[in-house]
């Protein structure tokens, strides 16, 4: 009886935890129709292939094998090239940083894992 109750509690906790996670999308799907995702919180994952920044914020390019997307990090620093990351943020169309313009970018809203 106790084991069954523990199983039920763990299942409920797992469901609550997963319900709070934004959906993970492929970068190619986002790039095909960025307007569909504009302003929405999503998650992407992949490897960092480029990055630049200073004083704790900057941009980095994440490639998930289907495409690549720039991510702006204001509070969490910029990972090095080759790092494997999962990022949660909001899609924004048109963004400027460091003298460069980005047509679509993910604005990081949670610390990455």
Protein language model regions, located:
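Sec-dependent bacterial lipoprotein signal peptides
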Residues: 1-21
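OB-fold and OB-like single-stranded nucleic-acid-recognition modules
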Residues: 17-113
């Amino acid at each position: 009886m106790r084991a069954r109750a523990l199983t039920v509690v763990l299942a409920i906790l797992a469901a609550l935890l997963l319900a709070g996670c934004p959906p993970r999308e492929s970068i190619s799907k986002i790039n095909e129709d960025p307007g569909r995702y504009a302003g929405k919180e999503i998650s992407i994952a992949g490897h960092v292939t480029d990055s630049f920044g200073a004083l704790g914020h900057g941009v980095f390019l994440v490639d998930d094998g289907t495409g690549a997307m720039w991510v702006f990090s204001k509070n969490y620093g910029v990972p090095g090239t080759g790092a494997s990351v999962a990022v949660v943020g909001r899609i924004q169309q048109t963004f400027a940083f460091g003298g460069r313009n980005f047509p679509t970018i993910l604005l990081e809203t949670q610390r990455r894992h």
